[in-house]
Amino acid sequence: MASSRQDYIAPWWTYWLHNFPHLNFNFQTVDNTFKPEDASYQQSLVFLACVSAVALGLCLLLLSVYLTCLCCCRREEDEEVKRPDTCCVTWAAVITGLVICSAVGVGFYGNSETNDGVYQLTYSIYNANHTLGGIGSMVGNSLGSMQVGLKEHLERLDEIFSPRGDYTQTLRFMQQMADNIIQQLTAMPETRKVQVDLAAIADRTAFIEYYRWLTYLLLLILDLVICLLACLALAKQSRWLLTVIMVCGMLTLIMSWASLGAGTATAVGTSDFCVSPDKYIVNQTKGTLSSDIVHYYLYCSQSLPNPFQQSLTIFQRSLTTMQIQVQGLLQFAVVVFPTAEKDLLGIQRLLNSSEFNLHQLTALLDCRSLHKDYLEALLGVCYDGVEGLLYLCLFSLLAACAFCALLCAVPRAWMLIAIRDRDYDDIDEEDPFNPTRRFNAYNPSRAQVHSFCSYSSSMGSQTSLQPPLQATSSTPEYMNQSMLFERNPRYENVPLIGSGSPPPSYSPSMRTTYLSMTDAQIRHFGTDFQV
C-alpha cells in the first residue's frame, strides 16, 4: 500500500531499520509489521533494547577484568619501571576527549532533529483535531437549527395558517425538507470521539517528548562536564578528581548503553510504522469509519469520489427548496396573515445561517486539509524524527566506547600519580645528592650567614648585599676555585661558586660596605654576620 503513494516516500533509513531482525524472547522471528498492541511485536522491540543491555554487561565485565589485572600487576610494574611512561595515558585521554566532544556535537544535532520532528507531528495532529472539531461544530449547529429552531417556527405557523390548507401543505413540505437535512447530517460520521482521541494522543506525545528532550540534554551536558573534569584532573594530577570521574564515568557509561537500547527500539518501531503507515491507520479505524472515508483522506486522489458529496448535495437542494417556499409565503401569505411575518423571517434567517454552515462544512470535509496535516505528520516523524534518533544512537554508541576507554585510562593515571607522590615521599633529606637539599643550601631565605661583597673593576662599581650560601667547603675546593680564577684580583672577593662557605678573609672594601649599611638593612639581615 505504501508503494502506491505518490506524495509520500519513506526514506531509505526507515527501510534499513525495518529490516532489522525482529525476534521474541524465544528467539523466534516475528512479523515486522507495526502492531504495537501485539505481545510478540512488543517482545521484538524489547529484545533489541536488551542487546544494548548485553553489551553493557560485557563492557562492565571487561572493565572488571582490566582493573583486576591492573591491581595485581601493580607491584611488579613498580619494581621494574623506575620512571613510568605516561605517553599512552596522555594519548588515550586526548583521543577520548575528542571522541566525547564529537559525540556530544552529534547528540545535540540528533536531539534537535528529533524534537523538530515530534513538534511537527504534534502540530499536525492539533491542526487535524481543529479541523475535526470544526466539522463537528458545523454539523451540530445545523442539526440544532433544523431540530429545534425550525420546528418551533413551523408549529406556530401551522396554527396561524390553519384556515388555509394550501399554506399548511407548504409547511408540511418544508418539514419534509428539514427531515431530509437531519437525516443526511445524522448519517455523517461522529467526529467527536476521533477528536478526543487525537487530542489525547497529541498531549501524551508532547509530554513524553519534553522529558525525552530534557533527559538527553542533561546527558549531553554531563558528558561535557566529565570531559572537562578529566582534563582538569590530568592537568592538576589530582587523584580525588580522578576518583570522581571514575564514579561519574561509570554512571554515564550505563546511561549511554541504556539510551542506545531505548533509541534503537524506538527507531525500529517508528520505521516499521513509516514503511506502511496507511495500512496501520486503516486497521485502527476499522469499525469506526468506513474504508471509503479513510482512503479518501489518506490518498486524496481526484479519482476517489467524495463520500460526503451526496449528503452535501441533498443538504443544499433541501435548503434551496425551503428558501423558495419561505420566499413565496412572505410574498403572498403575509398579506392575509400579518402575524406570520415574524416566524417566516425567523425561518429565513435560520436557513441563511444553515447555508453558511453548509459552505464551511463543505470546505472542512474536503480531503486536502486533513491530507496535508497527515503528510506533514509523516514527514516530521519519518524524516526528522527517525533521522534524529539515528544520530542519538550514534552519540550513545560513541559516548559508551569513549567512556569505556576513559575508565581504562583513569585508573592507570591514578596509579602513575600515586607512584610519583610515593617517590617524592621516599627522598632522603640527608642525601647530599638530594636536589631539594642542594636547593635549600642555595636558597637565600634559609641561609644563616649573610655576605656582602663589593665588585669593582672594569665591570663597574657596585655595592651588593648578597646573603652567603650556607655550606662547608674543603680547602682543595677553594684552592681549585682560586686556580679557576687564576688569582685575578677582579674575582678576589667573589663568594665560592658551588659552595656555601664564605671567603677565608674579608677585604677592607667588604668591611667598608658592612659599616656603611643602614639600620634598616641590619635589622633585615640580622646579626648573624659579624665582621
From Swiss-Prot:
Glycosylated residues (UniProt): N129, N283, N352
Extracellular topological domain: 1-44, 109-213, 261-389
Chain ranges passing through the membrane: 45-65, 88-108, 214-234, 240-260, 390-410
Cytoplasmic side stretches: 66-87, 235-239, 411-531
Predominant subcellular localization, coarse grouping: membrane
InterPro entries from the UniProt entry: Tweety
Keyword Transmembrane helix annotated: yes
Keywords: Calcium, Cell membrane, Chloride, Chloride channel, Glycoprotein, Ion channel, Ion transport, Membrane, Transmembrane, Transmembrane helix, Transport
Localization of this protein: Cell membrane
Cellular compartments per GO CC: chloride channel complex; plasma membrane
Keyword Ion transport appears in the UniProt entry: yes
Pfam families named among the record's database cross-references: Tweety
Membrane topology, record value: Multi-pass membrane protein
GO molecular function, one term: intracellularly calcium-gated chloride channel activity
Protein family: Belongs to the tweety family.
Task performed by this protein: Probable large-conductance Ca(2+)-activated chloride channel.
The name this protein goes by in its record: Protein tweety homolog 2-like
Biological source species: Danio rerio
Lineage summary: Eukaryota, Metazoa, Chordata, Craniata, Vertebrata
